[in-house]
């Protein structure tokens, strides 16, 4: 991570930290770097590709449940910038884990496929984003219940 700026370092650090289970940072870092090596062989600039993939998955709006007069409404709202990146990375990792369970292949390959799909604006994580935006759009008539 020598020639990277702070935003790029933060993105890689978040990817490793969200991926980590039971404190096994070295193992996770090896998986992430193997994935990046695979991306470098196919696409070229890995960091730009990863940043673009996260940008394509970032949700702009969210839906929160609010109780008004005994009825629960799905109220749309705007997602903070830090939260957008966090959700995008989390959704990419979730999608990679889902692929691993359904296809029984290595996690590096699944993460590689999901990052490429996110870069090309398709895949499981992109579908999750589209579903969230559709739900927010469908419930925009309840936006006047938003008081936060």
From Swiss-Prot:
Q: Does the keyword Nucleotide-binding apply?
A: no
Highest rank taxon of the organism: Eukaryota
Question: Which keywords does the record carry?
Answer: Mitochondrion, Ribonucleoprotein, Ribosomal protein, RNA-binding, rRNA-binding
Concerning PROSITE patterns, the annotation shows: RIBOSOMAL_S7
Further notes on this entry?
A: A second rps7 gene encoded in the mitochondria is identical to the plastid-encoded gene. It is not known if the plastid-derived gene is transcribed.
Described purpose of this protein according to its UniProt entry: One of the primary rRNA binding proteins, it binds directly to 18S rRNA where it nucleates assembly of the head domain of the small subunit.
The protein's name is: Small ribosomal subunit protein uS7m
The protein's organism comes out as Beta vulgaris (Sugar beet)
């Amino acid at each position: 991570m020598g020639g990277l700026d702070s935003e790029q370092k933060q993105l890689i650090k978040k990817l490793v930290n969200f991926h980590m289970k039971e404190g096994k940072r070295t193992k996770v870092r090896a998986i992430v770097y193997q994935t990046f090596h695979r991306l470098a062989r196919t696409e070229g600039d890995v960091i730009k590709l990863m940043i673009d993939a996260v940008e394509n998955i970032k949700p702009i709006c969210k839906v929160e449940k609010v109780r008004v007069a005994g009825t629960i409404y799905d109220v749309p709202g705007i997602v903070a910038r830090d939260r957008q990146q966090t959700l995008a990375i989390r959704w990419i990792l979730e999608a990679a884990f889902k692929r691993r369970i359904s296809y029984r292949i290595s996690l590096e390959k699944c993460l590689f496929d999901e990052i490429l799909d996110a870069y090309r604006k398709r895949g499981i994580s992109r579908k999750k984003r589209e579903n969230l935006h559709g739900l927010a759009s469908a419930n925009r008539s309840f936006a006047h219940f938003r008081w936060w």
